[in-house]
Amino acid sequence: MSHFELQPGQLQLSELRDWFYQHQTLKLSDEAKDNIATSAKTVADVLEQGRVVYGINTGFGLLANTRIPPERLTDLQRRIVLSHAAGTGDLMEDSVVRLMLLLKINSLSRGFSGVRQVLVDALIKLLNAEVYPCIPEKGSVGASGDLAPLAHMVLPLVGEGTVRHNGKVLNAEEGLKIAGIEPFELAPKEGLALLNGTQASTALALAGLFRIERNFHAAIVVGATSVEAAMGSRAPFDERVHAVRGQPGQIKAAEMLRHVLTDSSEIAKDHENCEKVQDPYSLRCQPQVMGAVLDQIEHASGILVREANGVTDNPLVFSEEQDIISGGNFHAEPVAMAADILAIAASEIGALSERRSALLIDSHLSKLPAFLVNDGGVNSGFMLAQVTAAALASENKTLAHPASVDSLPTSANQEDHVSMATFAARRLTDIAKNVSDIIAIEWLEAAQGLDFRRPLKGAAAVETAFNCLREQVAYYAEDRFFAPDIKAASDLIQNGELAAVVKLPHILSEV
C-alpha cells in the first residue's frame, strides 16, 4: 500500500490519477497542521469577540439574517448536514468518493476554513480505512457548492447515513467503528465548511478525465490499426504537414500515430506503390481531430487541477487580518465549463472511431470482405456491431450538449445563477463508457481486417495490440454471440491493459 503525505494545495495531476485508480494511506504535512490550527483559532477568537459572521452564528442562504444564539451553534451545524443530505439516484463509485474525501481534506488543509484538526483527522481516518460514505449522484446544481453530495459525505461523521466498506453497505455506526471514530459533534463553522465546496463536481470531472485519457490512448492505437487494416497511407502523418500548421495537439497526435505506425509494417510495404491517392477523412485527418481533442483535454485538466487545489469554502477565514469574508468560490462554473469541454472532446473521439468502423465493413472503401466475414449472406459479420457503434456515437452527441449554459434559480432566488457542474461532470462517465465501446467495436473490426491481410504483418505496436485483443477475443470465423466480444475489448481499454502494452509519447502534459 502506498503512503502519501499531503502538502496543502500542491496536488499534481498524476497524483490525483493515482488516487482515483488505487487506495493509498494519507497523512498531513506539518504545514497543513499549522494552517488548520491557525484558522480554527481565528474562528474561536471571532466568537469570543461576539462578532456576527455568516454561517458561524447566523442561518444559511436566505436565512442569513437570522442570528443564532450561542447555545444553539453546534446544533446549527448538525442540522445543516441533516437537512442538506437530500440527494437521489445511484450511489457514486468508491473511486469518486475517495477523490472527494481527498479534495475536501486538501481544501481544509489550506487553512482558510476554520475547522479543527480533529475534524480533518476524522476524514483522514475514513479515507485510510476505505470506509466510503454512500453518496447519491444527483441533487447538486453546482452552487452554493455541491451541498447535497457533500452533506451525504459528512453524514456518517455525525452518526447518520450509510457507508460502503469492501463493497458492503453498512450503517454509520458500523463504519465509524471500522475507521476508529466516535460520532462527531461539529463545532461552529464546521458543518458549513464541509458542505460548501466543489469537491463532488471536481471529483466526478476528474473521474471522467481519467477515463477519457484511456479512450484517447486507445483511439490512437486502434485508429492506427485501422490504417493498417484498410491499407491506408502514412503520408498524412508526416511531421512536416503538422509543423506548418503549428497546432500543438495536432503535432503531438501525429507523432503518436507515427510512433505506432513504424517502418516495420509489411502491410505498408506491400501497398506503398498503389494507385490510391487519398484516404477518407476518418483515416487521413486523425491528427487534426485527435490533436484538437488533446488540446481541449489538456486545457480542461489544467482547470480541474487548479480547482482540486483551490479553496471553495464560504465564508473564508483570513487569519493574518482576522477577517472572515463571504464570497462565491463555491460557484462551480470553472468545473462545469471544463466538463463541457471534455464532453465535446470525448464525443469527437467516438464520432471519428465510429466512422472508421463504418469504413472497415464497407468492402468498396476497405477492399476487405463485406462486413468483415467470409460466406457473407449466411453470415452477417460485423453488420450490427457497427450499428451499435452508430447508436452510441449518436447518444453521445446528445450527452455532449453543454450543461453550463443552463441555470435555474434556487433557494428562493438567493442563489439565482448556478453552474450545473455536477451533472456536467457526472455524464462524462456515461460518455466515456460509450466511447470505450465504440473504440472496442472498431478494434474488433480492425483486428479482423488484419487477419484478412495475413500473412502480411502490421507495424510492431499494431501487432502488440492485436495480440492483446486476440488473447481475449478469437478470430470471427462465423456468426456468434457478439456482445461478449465487445465487452471484452472494451474492458481492455477501460482497465488500462491496452495502455500498458502499447506506450505512447506525451498523452498528457502534467499540469
UniProtKB/Swiss-Prot annotation:
The modification 2,3-didehydroalanine (Ser) is found at residue 144. Its main location: cytoplasm. Contains an active site 4-methylidene-imidazol-5-one (MIO), which is formed autocatalytically by cyclization and dehydration of residues Ala-Ser-Gly. It is found in: Cytoplasm. GO terms for biological process: L-histidine catabolic process to glutamate and formamide; L-histidine catabolic process to glutamate and formate. There is a cross-link at residues 143-145 (5-imidazolinone (Ala-Gly)). Pathway: Amino-acid degradation; L-histidine degradation into L-glutamate; N-formimidoyl-L-glutamate from L-histidine: step 1/3. Its EC number is 4.3.1.3. Keywords: Cytoplasm, Histidine metabolism, Lyase. GO terms for molecular function: histidine ammonia-lyase activity. InterPro entries: Aromatic_Lyase, Fumarase/histidase_N, HutH, L-Aspartase-like, Phe/His_NH3-lyase_AS. GO terms for cellular component: cytoplasm. It catalyses: L-histidine = trans-urocanate + NH4(+). It is an enzyme of class 4 (lyase). Belongs to the PAL/histidase family. This is Histidine ammonia-lyase. It comes from Idiomarina loihiensis (strain ATCC BAA-735 / DSM 15497 / L2-TR).
